Design a protein with these regions (language model features):
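ATP-binding N-lobe of GHMP and related small-molecule kinases
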Residues: 1-95, 113, 117-122, 159-161, ...
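A generic "alpha-helical surface" signal
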Residues: 27, 64, 102, 225-228, ...
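Gly/Ser-rich oxyanion-binding loop with an adjacent helix/lid
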Residues: 78-151
């Protein structure tokens, strides 16, 4: 049994403030794309969970979000059976595409079917929130505004490219650790994010500009300011 794990991009991302708990409040427009990894699963009659990869990994399997997602679901719903998991990894690490989070979300969807739990999306999203800020969105994917640390989601009508519009995602061979990206990023406050949301919502209603037009014409990412000087290849 297989499950595709579509990655995501941020068509808009603004770092609003740093919180007292050390995390950052964001305003972002999430969009899944048609590229991603694939998670496969084979049912085990015992309760063991195994994980293998198509390429060598530099970290213990127990720290992988795929393994953590399987263990979390097994524990939360007292599943008596196990699973052999296989991750076909094609998305690059440290690229900001949410590859690991997408893999975790795909694992939850996959095991929901394999273990015949029949859980609604809402239950999967509750589990996903315990795995990482991006994971709840990637349970369903599509298009959504996200706030807080990324966990406060407002789904919107799915964005569709027009026939004459194309989106190319380029990932240079220069991984950027999350800690480095946040180190020098400016905190803008809420004004830019609120103005973006207002402009997006008015697109297609009070203006001839459609939502996808507005999104593509207003691509923005706060991390460019902190990342480009240290990672010129990304720029």
């Amino acid at each position: 049994m297989n499950e595709f794990a579509p990655a995501k991009i941020n068509l808009f991302l603004d770092v609003i403030r740093k919180r007292e708990d050390g995390y950052h409040d964001l305003g972002t427009l999430f969009q899944t794309i048609d590229a991603g990894d694939t998670v496969s699963a084979t049912l085990r009659e015992d309760d063991k969970i195994t994980l293998e990869y198509n390429v060598p990994q530099e970290y213990p399997k127990e720290s992988d979000l795929v393994y953590k997602a399987a263990l979390l679901m097994q524990d939360a719903y007292r599943v008596g059976k196990g699973v052999d998991l296989y991750l076909e990894k094609v998305m690059p690490l440290g690229a900001g595409l949410g590859g690991g989070s997408a893999d975790a979300a795909a694992t939850l969807r996959l095991l929901n079917r394999l273990w015949e739990l029949n859980l609604p999306y809402e239950a999967l999203e509750e589990l996903a929130a315990r795995l990482g800020a991006d994971v709840p969105f990637l349970v369903r994917g599509g298009s959504a505004f996200a706030e807080g640390i990324g966990e406060k989601l407002t789904p919107i009508e799915p964005l569709q490219l027009k026939d004459d519009q194309h989106l190319l995602v380029v990932t240079p061979l220069d991984a950027v650790p999350t800690k480095d990206a946040y180190a020098g990023v400016p905190k803008s406050g809420p004004d830019r994010w609120e103005a973006y949301k207002a402009g997006f919502k008015s697109a297609g209603s009070s203006t001839p500009v459609t939502p996808i037009d507005f999104a593509l014409e207003n691509v923005f990412n706060s991390f460019e300011i902190s990342v480009f000087p240290k990672h010129p290849l990304v720029e």
